[in-house]
Amino acid sequence: FGPGCGPSTFSCTSPQKILPGSSVSFPSGYSSIYLTTESGSASVYLDRPDGFWVGGADSRGCSNFGGFNGNGDSKVGNWGDVPVAAWACN
């Protein structure tokens, strides 16, 4: 996690690596998804049954999509040109 960021006290999945141009899916039951890169930044998107959002990830590890009730699978995609790590948390 980046300095002062990241869900260190929550119950989270293991990070999944998302290569540029690809996506990963997380099962239903998580309320937040955190994102980081090893270096640089990347545009990312989240596709869920209740909406579609575009955001960004950077090496500080502060980026997240949150506030969900946990219902529905979450698909996270990487529109950038550097790998992104994503993990889902309760």
Swiss-Prot record:
A GO MF label: carbohydrate binding
Domain of life, source organism: Eukaryota
Keywords: Lectin
Function: Lectin specific for core(alpha 1-6)fucosylated N-glycans. Inhibits platelet aggregation.
Name of the protein in its database record: Hypnin-A3
